[in-house]
């Protein structure tokens, strides 16, 4: 495994795959993981986890060598495929008829999925989207080092699809010594804007890094969200202090563990700080409001290599006539307009226009147009 801030680079488009016969089919999650492993987004990982690292991550939130890592990055295959594979073999990694990489098989093992669900997602409830996906995927895991032999050609947002080495370069070019990362799978509403701008007061740059991999079906589609980020940045943010680029990973909905994972990945993209808000990467009522912040107390900033910035729940206060949080506003709940991505989605789907205290009008216009289009194509 590489050292903390060294980026792994496992992209080799000249790699000779002509003699490799066997192949493993990748689902969309494994495909996006393959890319992030190869481009260094998941440094220090150099491949899909073998049994030792897998067990260690599930049980201790660390790799076998002690490095912090909180989400198991695994390659599931069916029992039938597993029977045809053996340790030491090189196997092609395929999706949609294209070979995207190879794996040097080091390990083939059957995980205890119930244990993985319980420890990673804190529930075995199949109504939880992460658990549902875990149980739907095949039941044998293949571990081993990978090489990415073909870059994806159909990235939906090519101009915003940058590798960690490119975002690091971009921050350097802009002279940013300190950069705060913000992870989102929702359109940015006023509470997010308030938090981002509060963080921007103490660092050189903001890295807005929306997740555009697989999400649950009622999340707003990535293309609509991207347009909403563009109009927001154009109209309400200083252009030289913000950089927008996509995070092509799938959403795990693993709450606290995913908050650690999101921070580690943003460190690889070049961030020095990472925003952790209310119920980060949560879903439903599976996690406590500030559980994703509390989990960080188990690790030192040195071993994480990135500084988490914790924010209270923010809201619009009708008495203050401004965005605020419980840290800055003395008024009661009756004066607070609570904003959330879920609430915005709900209003829009019911044909209601969120008030300007919720979302900027330009953003609302993009969302309404996008959701109308979605309804037409359904």
Curated annotation (Swiss-Prot):
Pfam families: ATP-sulfurylase (PF01747), PUA_2 (PF14306)
Pathway where this protein functions: Sulfur metabolism; hydrogen sulfide biosynthesis; sulfite from sulfate: step 1/3
Disulfide bonds: none
Keywords per UniProt: ATP-binding, Nucleotide-binding, Nucleotidyltransferase, Transferase
Domain of life: Bacteria
Record's keyword annotation contains Transmembrane: no
Gene Ontology biological process terms from the UniProt entry: hydrogen sulfide biosynthetic process; sulfate assimilation
InterPro entries, A to Z: ATP-Sase_PUA-like_dom (IPR025980), PUA-like_sf (IPR015947), Rossmann-like_a/b/a_fold (IPR014729), SO4_adenylyltransferase_pro (IPR020792), Sulfurylase_cat_dom (IPR024951), Sulphate_adenylyltransferase (IPR002650)
GO molecular function annotations of the record: ATP binding; sulfate adenylyltransferase (ATP) activity
Keyword rRNA-binding among UniProt keywords: no
Catalytic activity entry: sulfate + ATP + H(+) = adenosine 5'-phosphosulfate + diphosphate
Enzyme Commission code: 2.7.7.4
Family label: Belongs to the sulfate adenylyltransferase family.
NCBIfam families: PRK04149.1 (NF003166), sopT (TIGR00339)
Name of the featured protein: Sulfate adenylyltransferase
């Amino acid at each position: 495994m590489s050292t903390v801030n060294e980026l792994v680079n496992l992209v080799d488009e000249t790699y000779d795959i002509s003699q490799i016969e066997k192949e493993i089919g990748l689902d969309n999650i494994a495909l996006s993981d393959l890319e992030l492993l190869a481009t260094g987004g998941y440094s220090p990982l150099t491949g899909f986890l073998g049994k030792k690292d897998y067990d260690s991550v599930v049980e201790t939130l660390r790799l076998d060598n002690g490095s912090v890592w909180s989400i198991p990055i695994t390659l599931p295959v069916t029992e039938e495929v597993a029977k045809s594979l053996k340790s030491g073999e090189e196997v092609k990694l395929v999706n949609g008829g294209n070979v995207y990489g190879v794996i040097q098989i080091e390990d083939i093992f059957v995980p205890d999925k119930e244990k993985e669900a319980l420890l990673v997602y804190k529930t075995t409830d199949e109504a939880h989207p992460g658990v549902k996906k875990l149980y739907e995927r095949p039941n044998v895991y293949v571990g081993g080092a990978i090489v990415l032999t073909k870059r994806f050609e159909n990235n939906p947002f090519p101009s915003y699809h940058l590798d960690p080495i490119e975002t690091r370069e971009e921050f350097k070019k802009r002279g940013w010594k300190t950069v705060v990362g913000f992870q989102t799978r929702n359109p940015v509403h006023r509470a997010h804007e308030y938090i981002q701008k509060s963080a921007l007061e103490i660092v050189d740059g903001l890295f807005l890094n929306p997740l555009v991999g697989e999400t649950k079906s009622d999340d707003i589609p990535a293309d609509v969200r991207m347009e909403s980020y563009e109009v927001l940045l154009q109209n309400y943010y200083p252009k030289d202090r913000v950089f927008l680029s996509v995070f092509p990973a799938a959403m795990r909905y693993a709450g606290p563990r995913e908050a650690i994972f999101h921070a580690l990945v943003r460190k690889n993209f070049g961030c020095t700080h990472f925003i952790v808000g209310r119920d980060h990467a949560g879903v439903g009522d599976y996690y406590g409001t500030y559980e994703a912040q509390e989990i960080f107390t188990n690790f030192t900033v040195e071993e994480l290599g990135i500084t988490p910035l914790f924010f209270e729940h923010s809201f619009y206060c009708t008495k203050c006539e401004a965005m605020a949080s419980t840290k800055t506003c003395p008024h009661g709940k009756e004066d607070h307009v609570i904003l959330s991505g879920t609430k915005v989605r709900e209003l829009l789907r019911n044909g209601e226009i969120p008030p300007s205290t919720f979302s900027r009008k330009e953003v609302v216009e993009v969302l309404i147009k996008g959701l109308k289009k979605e309804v037409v194509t359904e």
